[in-house]
Amino acid sequence: MSRLPEVMADVDALSGLQRLISVFCDFWAHDHDLIARLHSVGASDPEFSQAVFARNKRRRLALSALVNRMVNSGHVRNAAAPELVDVLLALTSFSFFAELTAGGRPVEIVCRIVQNLSADAVRRASSDTT
């Protein structure tokens, strides 16, 4: 997570998104079992639930900042931005990562899958048809 300031400062928001996804993949993979337990506990423990909610909120803010930069540069339609943020939030979630790694798929491949799906979502948000 120490790479976040550098990633968010990337002048190319599309590149920044790809790099941000790499950061999340590395984070989710670093201590996968512990994070899975925390998410499980968070479902029944209000304090852990608040911590997970706060982390997800920070992730949404980072994604929103990148998407807003894409809108400002003309890469994404303004009307498509809210939905794009929601899709990117789902794609970068621990739950999505855990599903893709559950069968033993390597983290590098999972990261590439998430990056490709995210790039596709951005392309869809840039076109006139969704």
Tell me what each language-model feature is.
Residues 1-30:
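Hydrophobic alpha-helical connector segments
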Residues 2-7, 38-46:
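Short linear capping/connector segments at secondary-structure termini
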Residues 6-13, 41, 52, 56, ...:
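Alpha-helix initiation/capping motif
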Residues 10-11, 31, 45, 103, ...:
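Short coil/turn helix-boundary motifs
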Residues 22-39, 46-73, 82-86, 111, ...:
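Amphipathic alpha-helical packing segments from all-alpha helical-bundle domains
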Residues 71-117, 125-130:
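Hydrophobic/aromatic-rich alpha-helical bundle segments in the mid-to-C-terminal region
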